[in-house]
Amino acid sequence: MPQMIPFFFMNQLTYGFTFILTILFLTSYVFLPMILRLYISRLYISKL
């Protein structure tokens, strides 16, 4: 059914954008501060 192709692509695009935004949000708010705290604590311990 060629009528469904634009809806399929819009659905795929919408879910792709939400997936990318979710990954970006999780990376920026969860993983990056965790890595930064780990790096700062290693730096602080090595200076002792």
Curated annotation (Swiss-Prot):
Predominant localisation class: mitochondrion
Annotated GO MF terms: proton-transporting ATP synthase activity, rotational mechanism
Native source organism of the sequence: Eremothecium gossypii (strain ATCC 10895 / CBS 109.51 / FGSC 9923 / NRRL Y-1056)
Pfam families in the record: Fun_ATP-synt_8
GO annotation (BP), single: proton motive force-driven ATP synthesis
Name of the protein in question: ATP synthase protein 8
Subcellular location field: Mitochondrion membrane
Function: Mitochondrial membrane ATP synthase (F(1)F(0) ATP synthase or Complex V) produces ATP from ADP in the presence of a proton gradient across the membrane which is generated by electron transport complexes of the respiratory chain. F-type ATPases consist of two structural domains, F(1) - containing the extramembraneous catalytic core and F(0) - containing the membrane proton channel, linked together by a central stalk and a peripheral stalk. During catalysis, ATP synthesis in the catalytic domain of F(1) is coupled via a rotary mechanism of the central stalk subunits to proton translocation.
PANTHER family for this protein: ATP SYNTHASE PROTEIN 8
Disulfides per UniProt: none
Family, per entry: Belongs to the ATPase protein 8 family.
InterPro entries: ATP_synth_su8_fun
Annotated keywords: ATP synthesis, CF(0), Hydrogen ion transport, Ion transport, Membrane, Mitochondrion, Transmembrane, Transmembrane helix, Transport
Record's bilayer topology term: Single-pass membrane protein
Assembly description: F-type ATPases have 2 components, CF(1) - the catalytic core - and CF(0) - the membrane proton channel. In yeast, the dimeric form of ATP synthase consists of 18 polypeptides: alpha, beta, gamma, delta, epsilon, 4 (B), 5 (OSCP), 6 (A), 8, 9 (C), d, E (Tim11), f, g, h, i, j and k.
GO cellular component, one term: mitochondrial inner membrane
Bilayer-spanning residue ranges: 13-35
